[in-house]
């Protein structure tokens, strides 16, 4: 009897040990599987971006299929979950590149994503390390296969940027302004730069107002005003919810031979007390204040947040910084002061003078460039104002008034090569 009990106890012990071993192996296997936490699709006329965010860096393979044209991405060590299943619903009917998408568990270790296309594309895939609240990201950008044949300067610059050819595509800096009356010899060319876009939302207010949205609205209003001026021509670095690298923004201004560059933003700080409008210009000798330095650092992080492929990293610290002319910075300060004076008539000023710091987006060596912080989106009252059509229109009108005042004070046009 006792021998029988001993045998039963031994069997139970072995069964328990086996169960514990299986549980342990199961937990190890589960821990080794990457967890996809978000999928985002950003369609735009220039390119469509698909972002897969996960708790671990993803291993992937990409290939193409024909009849119909498809891009296939296999992600290893991932299990299909509700986040991945929801990707198909994110494909918009007006996406220029993706017709539809489907996701499935291809084998026990692999999830397969299949994108049916509306046109031939050049896919580019790269990984982004965690930054600013984002986890590991796998990014797929879909560019049109005939990109070089299209008459879209921004698209061409994006292509050049991602191939590492941006430098030789940008016209060289000129020696200085050319004499002549602005708007009389030729139209004044103005490049508007709505900050952030796509993955990079910019600052977000208490009530979830996103900087990238309000600054695009302000830029569109300003564009409409400038288009009514007979002696001005206007371009925008982006007119969609799309990520544009900082150096591409600068390069587009140079390619369009802009006379002025205006980057539009909505300020934020760690506390909700600061308020008011500000204007910034470039400095090659350090920031004029701690706040200006902090702001430049946060704005310059846009490429890390928005997502720049490794092939473009060489341009982030380009020697363009060393080429900036002191004359251009002096003109930027004059231009900034003219705009700041006009902003002071419609909103409190955070600082009464134009501040300076090393903003990457202001580094065009031959174009007077300013960064306008329209208001503090982190301030609850100013967040409310930023959402209103009235305040947006007032800001747009103030910037245009500043542009006119700058040229009325004797500013000359940028030299044309």
UniProtKB/Swiss-Prot annotation:
PROSITE patterns: TAT. It catalyses: Hydrolyzes the link between N-acetylmuramoyl residues and L-amino acid residues in certain cell-wall glycopeptides. Disruption phenotype: Mutants are growing in chains of 3 to 6 cells. Disulfide bonds: none annotated. N-terminal domain is required and sufficient for targeting to the septal ring. Exported by the Tat system. The position of the signal peptide cleavage has not been experimentally proven. Can also be exported by the Sec system. This is N-acetylmuramoyl-L-alanine amidase AmiC. The gene is amiC.
């Amino acid at each position: 009897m006792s021998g029988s009990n001993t045998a039963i106890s031994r069997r139970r012990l072995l069964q328990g040990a086996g169960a514990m071993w299986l549980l342990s192996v199961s937990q190890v296997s589960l821990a080794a599987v990457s967890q996809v936490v978000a999928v985002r699709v950003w369609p735009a006329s220039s390119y469509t971006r698909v972002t897969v965010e996960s708790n671990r860096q993803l291993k992937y393979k990409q290939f193409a299929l024909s009849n119909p044209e498809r891009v296939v991405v296999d992600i290893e060590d991932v299990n299909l979950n509700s986040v991945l299943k929801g990707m198909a619903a994110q494909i918009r009917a007006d996406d220029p590149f993706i017709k539809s998408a489907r996701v499935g568990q291809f084998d026990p270790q692999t999830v397969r994503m299949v994108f049916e296309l509306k046109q031939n594309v050049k896919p580019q895939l790269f990984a982004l390390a965690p930054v600013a609240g984002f986890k590991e990201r796998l990014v797929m950008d879909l560019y049109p296969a005939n990109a070089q044949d299209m008459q879209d300067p921004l698209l061409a610059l994006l292509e050049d940027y991602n191939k590492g050819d941006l430098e030789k595509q940008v016209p060289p800096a000129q020696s200085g302004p050319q004499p002549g009356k602005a708007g009389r010899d030729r139209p004044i060319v103005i490049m508007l730069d709505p900050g952030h876009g796509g993955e990079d939302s910019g600052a977000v207010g208490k009530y979830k107002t996103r900087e990238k949205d309000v600054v695009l609205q302000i830029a569109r209003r300003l564009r409409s005003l400038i288009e009514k001026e007979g002696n001005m021509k206007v371009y925008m670095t982006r007119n969609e919810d799309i990520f544009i690298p900082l150096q591409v923004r600068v390069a587009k201004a140079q390619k369009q031979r802009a006379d002025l560059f205006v980057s539009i933003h909505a300020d934020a700080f760690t506390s909700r007390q600061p308020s008011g409008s500000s204007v910034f210009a470039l400095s090659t000798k350090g920031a004029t204040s701690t706040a200006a330095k902090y702001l430049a650092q946060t704005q310059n992080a846009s490429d890390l947040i928005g997502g720049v492929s490794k092939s473009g990293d060489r341009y982030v610290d380009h020697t363009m910084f060393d080429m900036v002319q002191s004359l251009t910075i002096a003109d930027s300060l004059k231009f900034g002061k003219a705009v700041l004076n006009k902003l002071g008539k419609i909103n409190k000023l955070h600082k009464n003078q134009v501040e300076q710091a090393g903003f990457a987006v202001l580094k065009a060596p031959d174009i007077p460039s300013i960064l306008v912080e329209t208001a503090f989106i982190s301030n609850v009252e100013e967040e409310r104002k930023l959402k209103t059509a009235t305040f947006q229109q007032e800001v747009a009108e103030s910037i245009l008034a500043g542009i006119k005042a700058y040229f009325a004070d004797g500013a000359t046009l940028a030299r044309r090569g």
